[in-house]
A protein has these predicted regions:
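Chalcogenol-based redox active-site neighborhoods
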Residues: 1-157
Length: 157
């Protein structure tokens, strides 16, 4: 599958979310949506990323944006992650990996000489019309949430 690019329509999704219920991209039409994909709840980089987005949530909201984190973890895992770290972002559970695949972030990775399938840490900014307005792949966590916020503010202006 071709990688998503700026200007492409963002694939819609409906996923079970932390706290019960579901989260759907289409339910936020008219708003900017930050969709960030991360490998695993409560691991070092993923925790820093989630807490960074959480600390900036008021600024994202005042710019008219919502934040959705997605990983292949279970809802139960998400609930524990949210409770442990006081997260304010929505977390979608993609155990089937259909959304991960639709966004092209479920990829072959390698560590210590072994290859395996996993999530490539990536973020997509979806505009009010449902089109991709920003793409960050192979994200390095330090400063990432701030960079995404600046992009949101630039689009909101």
């Amino acid at each position: 599958m071709a990688e998503l690019s700026i200007g492409d329509m963002a694939p819609d999704f409906t996923l079970p979310r932390d706290g019960g219920g579901t989260v759907s991209l289409s339910s936020f039409k008219g708003k900017q949506v930050v969709v960030y994909f991360y490998p695993k709840d409560d691991t070092s980089g993923c925790t820093v990323e989630a807490t960074s987005f959480t600390s900036l949530t008021p600024e994202f909201e005042s710019s008219g944006a919502v934040i959705i984190g997605i990983s292949p973890d279970t809802v139960k895992s998400h609930d524990k992650f949210v409770a442990k770290h006081g997260l304010a972002v929505m977390l979608g559970s993609d155990e089937e990996k259909t959304t991960l695949e639709a966004y092209g972030v479920w990829k072959e990775k390698s560590m210590y000489g072994k290859t395996y399938m996993g999530v490539e840490r990536s973020t997509f900014l979806v505009d009010a019309d449902g089109r991709i307005a920003g793409v960050w792949r192979k994200v390095k966590v330090p400063g990432h949430a701030e960079a995404v916020l600046q992009a949101v503010k630039g689009k909101a202006a």
